[in-house]
Amino acid sequence: MKWSEMASVNATQQHLNFSSSWEEDSSDNSFDEWTHKSVPLRSPCRTPRIQRHRNRSITVSPSVPTSPIPYAAWKKLRLCDSPSTPKSLLSKSTMPCSSSKTCRSQRFLRLSTAFERVPSVNINPFTPDTVRRNSEHYKRKSQRSDDDEDYGPRSKEIQNSSEDESFFLPSKRPAVSARMLSRYESEFLELACIGVGEFGSVYRCVKRLDGCMYAIKRSRRPIAGSANEQLALKEVYAHAVLGHHPHVVRYYSAWAEDDHMIIQNEYCDGGSLHDAITEKREQGEFFSVPELRDLLLQVSMGLKYIHNSGLVHLDIKPSNIFICRRSTLSAGGEGDSEEEDESHSSGVVYKIGDLGHVTSISSPQVEEGDSRFLAYEVLREDYTHLPKADIFALGLTVLLAAGASPLPQNGDDWHRLRQGELPNLPHELPALFKDLLKSLLDPDPTARPSATALCRHDVLCKERAGKLATQLRKELNVEKFRTAMLERELKEARLAATSPQQSCQPGSLPKAKRKLVGRNVARSVSFGFPGY
């Protein structure tokens, strides 16, 4: 090695020794304190000290050049395995605040970004206000710390900034991987296509795990970013909020595959009311008056539950009312009342489905449904009495089941129905029931009965009262039979209790016989203990 190269190495080592010594002097001080204080810098040309050991002799060959810095001085430079590298120093210089201030700013940053970041879950717009307020109060309580003195001013600033923004943040779209297994194909066995609509198709499937039948609705086209995306999300939101009710189609789960929405619902083995009306019309038949009363009563119960939940359906029609042929009792769902606790003797249960047009009563975002069942006030964008629009559509649905001709989409006949005129029917209805249907089609929405009033109407309660009387008579006969059986058992027990006292006189007891327990072991029949 030449002496010029050795000089350059020596200068480099001196510069590195300067960086290391500055790190030792300023490692305990923050960058902001260093900027306000003048730190005396050592001379960059100072040669590093060399510690020589007396007991060590260093022999230097005159022909072979060696490093001017021994091993001990080289280790003192702290260039090996040192965390204080130039990169770490640079990262420290980019943070102008002290350690205590950094922790506070980081806590504020985490708190503010928690409100500003895009949510990882969807926000259900149909969630009741009480549940939403409780969740926000719990979130604020969990974010506050006992030793955080600046929480009050920060929370006010965050609250003011969050109120300016829209409450409903963008919906979360699930990431779909090409290697992801299809849940629909792995968990369900498709049997048949039972319906095709504007949104997509409905399939009758068997779940491989539990062996039960379900109705799986799948969107026809990818809905991500399309107009149908909001309709699909509305249906999922409404089903999730409503829960389980005997007159609303039950919801189980929903997921997305390849940007297609898939909804797992309850399977109704009787098909839709539209199918039943079409089948009867082809056979020259129509629904009888008791069947019409049962239809009107059960759908009114479902609408009552939906309206009491703060929602409106806005798409009531025969194709969205489904039939279960099996005989079921009222399952005690949420919102049940005394008029719902009945057994359907006909074995037919009507359920409201297809909640794609559901919206909130307090803050409506109306998507107009089928124009044949649309109330006139909704067409005029008067949303002050939205639940009465469902009542109007229910009246037209009952008229179709009674044998009315298909409803017009526009024209004079369409306007005559909105004026409260009933269409011609193939058979005469009772006067009271006919007046009830006229009230459902009243041009004034305030004059139409509510779903709760329909459930208690005298015309519908008479039919229900007859069913209840028959059921009560059956239950009374069963209770009479049980009472007779209990009386007979009680009489026999009394006779058995008095007979030993009459037959057993003093001195008339038979002699006790000896019984063998085991081998050659005698034991008395009496099991009394001495002293008792």
From Swiss-Prot:
Main subcellular location: nucleus
Molecular function terms, GO-annotated: ATP binding; magnesium ion binding; non-membrane spanning protein tyrosine kinase activity; protein tyrosine kinase activity
Top-rank taxon: Eukaryota
Keywords linked to the UniProt accession: ATP-binding, Coiled coil, Kinase, Magnesium, Meiosis, Metal-binding, Nucleotide-binding, Nucleus, Transferase, Tyrosine-protein kinase
UniProt: Mg(2+) binding residues: 320, 354
Residue sites binding ATP per the record: 194-202, 217
Stored Pfam families: Pkinase
SMART domains (UniProt xref): S_TKc
Domain Protein kinase, chain residue ranges per copy: 188-465
Compartment list: Nucleus
GO cellular component terms, semicolon-separated: cytoplasm; nucleus
GO biological process: meiotic cell cycle; mitotic cell cycle; regulation of meiosis I
Broad enzyme group: transferase
UniProt-annotated stretches for the region Disordered: 123-166
InterPro entries hit by this protein: CC_SR_Kinase (IPR050339), Kinase-like_dom_sf (IPR011009), Prot_kinase_dom (IPR000719), Protein_kinase_ATP_BS (IPR017441), Ser/Thr_kinase_AS (IPR008271), Wee1-like_protein_kinase (IPR017164)
Catalytic activity of the protein: L-tyrosyl-[protein] + ATP = O-phospho-L-tyrosyl-[protein] + ADP + H(+)
Coiled coil regions in record: 469-495
EC number: 2.7.10.2
Role summary: Oocyte-specific protein tyrosine kinase that phosphorylates and inhibits cdk1 and acts as a key regulator of meiosis. Required to maintain meiotic arrest in oocytes by phosphorylating cdk1 at 'Tyr-15', leading to inhibit cdk1 activity and prevent meiotic reentry.
Similarity section: Belongs to the protein kinase superfamily. Ser/Thr protein kinase family. WEE1 subfamily.
Stated name of the protein: Wee1-like protein kinase 2
Species the sequence originates in: Danio rerio
